[in-house]
Each structure stands twice: as C-alpha cells, then as structure tokens.
C-alpha cells in the first residue's frame, strides 16, 4: 500500500499545521453524509528549482484558511518527494464535484494560483476513484509513503477486497498507523495509487515488520505487474476530521 499540508485543514504541515491533535483517537472511513465514496484526485505539483518552500508559504497565506472553512473540502494530504524536493504529490478528497468547484473557484484559490505562477513549473491532475480511505479521527503523522501499483486485471477484485480489509484493520488496530488511502486511476482502474501516513519512523517500521502486514504483502505481491514506491521528506500531517460522520 502507499502518498504536506498544502492549502487545507487536514493536510500536511510542511507548510504549517492548522489543527491540534488529541492522543485519544479512533478509526473511520471517509465518506459523504449519504455514506458514499467522496470525490478523489491527485495533484502532482512541480516547482521551479528550490521553489517548493515559497509555494508552501504562498498556499499558507492565501488558500489555506479558506480551505479549512470549506465543509466540503475533506482533506488535502500529501508529501514532498525525498528524492526530488521540487515535487509534491497531493491527495485531494472532496465531498462532491460541487465541493471541488467551490474550492477551486474561490477568491482565495484564485489568489493562490496567480501568486504561485513564478515558482510553478508543472501541475498534473490525476482523476481517481477511492477503494479505501481509512484514517484515525485525530493525529499528526511525520512519515508518509506512497506507492503506484499495476494490478493484473484478473486479480483486481481480489486485490481490492484484501487491501480494503488490511487498510481498515491497520488503522483500527495499529496505534501508529494514522491513515491508509488506496485509489484507482479513473481511466485505468488496475493502476493503483496509495498513501500511508504513520505517526513516526518507529510506527512505520513496526507496521512493516508485523505479521499482519507480512501476510497481506505475501498475498498481494503476486497480483502486481509493476510496483513503485515514493518515500517523502519528513513533515507533519495534521489529520482532518471532515468526512467522518460516525464520530
């Protein structure tokens, strides 16, 4: 399985946190009020050389406060690539397309978009569908990993079932596993993009060494025709509790 707070409430605070975490937390699936999977996409942002820090400051000063107030902007979680600090991958979760429209057309977002132009080299949006969006209701994660998997099409249904089960189990049972997010490309449903959020390095290593994780990986590894892992720079992801309706 596998993807800093850019503009919103529950995102990574490479650029500064907005919400305080509580040590007492429980696990939940992010859903709409009707119980449906929310709208999901990935934004891959590339800055000019050395420009990511400036882009973060711009986001924090423009669109960040607005995003925190938007009820339909559930989460903006991401990380900066440890191998290329000019690249950030951001998982965006919205209640609906209308919620995304409200976010992306707001005056604050337009101000952010205009101000970042001098340091923005490239932006790519990848439409996706959620498979598992599991997280604790509170917490601050310092370690983020992302993966891209290509699943053998005939194995996709079984992969989705096993992965959903393990994502829920890990977030529920493992104290240091704060979030497990699994998505499929909209136009290529066997291409999987994941994000894992851990409290710290120790929590990551403990999960990787656990019997449950080892068993899960033994089951799903034969289902992949390609795997790619992204390790992200250390940061602070402050979890959002938007999209959690059974608190």
Name each model-derived stretch:
Residues 1-11:
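Bacterial N-terminal signal peptides that target proteins for export
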Residues 10-22:
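Bacterial N-terminal signal peptides
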Residues 27-37, 74-86, 111-150, 178-191, ...:
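Glycine-rich beta-strand-turn "strand-cap" elements at beta-sheet edges
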Residues 37-46:
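Acidic/histidine-rich, surface-exposed loop or edge segments in extracytoplasmic proteins
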Residues 45-50, 94-95, 150-154, 198-199:
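Structural beta->alpha junctions
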Residues 51-73, 108-112, 155-178, 212-216, ...:
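Short amphipathic alpha-helical segments
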Residues 53, 95-106, 157, 199-210:
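Short amphipathic alpha-helices within nucleic acid-binding modules
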Residues 140-200, 206-207:
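Conserved small-residue-rich
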